[in-house]
Structure formats: C-alpha cells, structure tokens
C-alpha cells in the first residue's frame, strides 16, 4: 500500500476519480443588474420584472446548444480541452459567426 487513496496510479494520469461539485441554481449567478446592463447595451429603457427569469431561461438553452456542439467538436478531435475555435465553429454551425478568435 503506497497510501495514495483510491486512484493512486503514481504521477499524473489518475483516472476520473475527482470529486465533482454538484451544480445547482448557477443560472441565478446571472444577476438582475447583469441582465439590466445587457438590455441597456441593446438600447432598452424600461424593463418588466418578468424579463429576468425569462432571460435566464433563454440564455441557458442557448449556452447548452453552443456547448453541446463545441464539446462534439472537441470529442471528434480526440481532445479533452474545449478550445476557443471549438466554440467559434459551434457558433458558426448555428448561423452566428463570431470574428476575432482565430480561424
């Protein structure tokens, strides 16, 4: 027994035995003032109270779609790290071309 715990394979390359923090209600991290600032940038003067939850929902769906596509590109390339280019290609696939991040 080398006293390295369950995943002890020596240096590096220690399987997928890390503890993952359970993610709950992270969408609430998109705060009311943050949504208000985005709306102001878009030229909105007055905002209904119901907008905030609706915006969080729409943003969540949008990000899920982009991230799913970006991860698909990453997996296809047999990588474990999602690159900026994966996200650029994912956005392009959805018809939202983004300039300024290479490619």
UniProtKB/Swiss-Prot annotation:
<protein>
    <recommendedName>
        <fullName>Histone H4</fullName>
    </recommendedName>
</protein>
<dbReference type="GO" id="GO:0005634">
    <property type="term" value="C:nucleus"/>
</dbReference>
<dbReference type="GO" id="GO:0003677">
    <property type="term" value="F:DNA binding"/>
</dbReference>
<feature type="modified residue" description="N6-methyllysine">
    <location>
        <position position="21"/>
    </location>
</feature>
<comment type="function">
    <text>Core component of nucleosome. Nucleosomes wrap and compact DNA into chromatin, limiting DNA accessibility to the cellular machineries which require DNA as a template. Histones thereby play a central role in transcription regulation, DNA repair, DNA replication and chromosomal stability. DNA accessibility is regulated via a complex set of post-translational modifications of histones, also called histone code, and nucleosome remodeling.</text>
</comment>
<comment type="subunit">
    <text>The nucleosome is a histone octamer containing two molecules each of H2A, H2B, H3 and H4 assembled in one H3-H4 heterotetramer and two H2A-H2B heterodimers. The octamer wraps approximately 147 bp of DNA.</text>
</comment>
<feature type="region of interest" description="Disordered">
    <location>
        <begin position="1"/>
        <end position="20"/>
    </location>
</feature>
<feature type="modified residue" description="N6-acetyl-N6-methyllysine; alternate">
    <location>
        <position position="6"/>
    </location>
</feature>
<keyword id="KW-0158">Chromosome</keyword>
<keyword id="KW-0488">Methylation</keyword>
<dbReference type="InterPro" id="IPR035425">
    <property type="entry name" value="CENP-T/H4_C"/>
</dbReference>
<dbReference type="GO" id="GO:0030527">
    <property type="term" value="F:structural constituent of chromatin"/>
</dbReference>
<dbReference type="InterPro" id="IPR001951">
    <property type="entry name" value="Histone_H4"/>
</dbReference>
<dbReference type="InterPro" id="IPR004823">
    <property type="entry name" value="TAF_TATA-bd_Histone-like_dom"/>
</dbReference>
<keyword id="KW-0007">Acetylation</keyword>
<dbReference type="InterPro" id="IPR009072">
    <property type="entry name" value="Histone-fold"/>
</dbReference>
<feature type="modified residue" description="N6-acetyllysine">
    <location>
        <position position="17"/>
    </location>
</feature>
<feature type="DNA-binding region">
    <location>
        <begin position="17"/>
        <end position="21"/>
    </location>
</feature>
<keyword id="KW-0238">DNA-binding</keyword>
<dbReference type="Pfam" id="PF15511">
    <property type="entry name" value="CENP-T_C"/>
</dbReference>
<feature type="modified residue" description="N-acetylserine">
    <location>
        <position position="2"/>
    </location>
</feature>
<dbReference type="GO" id="GO:0000786">
    <property type="term" value="C:nucleosome"/>
</dbReference>
<comment type="similarity">
    <text>Belongs to the histone H4 family.</text>
</comment>
<dbReference type="InterPro" id="IPR019809">
    <property type="entry name" value="Histone_H4_CS"/>
</dbReference>
<feature type="modified residue" description="N6-acetyl-N6-methyllysine; alternate">
    <location>
        <position position="13"/>
    </location>
</feature>
<keyword id="KW-0544">Nucleosome core</keyword>
<keyword id="KW-0539">Nucleus</keyword>
<feature type="compositionally biased region" description="Gly residues">
    <location>
        <begin position="1"/>
        <end position="14"/>
    </location>
</feature>
<dbReference type="GO" id="GO:0046982">
    <property type="term" value="F:protein heterodimerization activity"/>
</dbReference>
